[in-house]
Amino acid sequence: KDRDLVTSIDQLAGTKNRVTGTQLGRIAMQLMNLNPVPVAWEETIDGLKQGLIDGAETWASAVAYANMAPVVSQSVDLRFFSGNEHCGMSSKVFDSLDGPLQDAVMESAYLAQVQSQAANEAALIKTVGFSDPQLPDTIFAENNVRTAFLSDEELKKKWVDER
């Protein structure tokens, strides 16, 4: 909580960060000069509390719902993973439907995705407090979690190959 607000990916170099089991996450962290540490999700909060890890690859909403906000001082928006939800249906079942019903399922799935994404985006600001400035009475505001939104120029340093 006593560190300056992160404004550069380089400020995170050398930190130990919980990484999911994905190769993409590990590779992305290595490209940012972070030290990816495989830690089970259920052990992440204890790792943060005990100082075994400096941070975690996760989303702001996960910090809020997993009650990590009391031990997190900053939420740094690195924009290297998207937060996607998945809902599936058996292809055999879908293929057995008549054409108009398949169209209705596809339209319903699309509209459900639009609605849930809009609700998630609103909750990030109104409930979690993942905004600058933060709204009062959000989980981040109540726990003094600062949000660090890096500039587009800063993000391009790591994510855009300008060759």
What are these regions (language model features)?
Residues K1-R163:
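N-terminal secretory/targeting leader peptides
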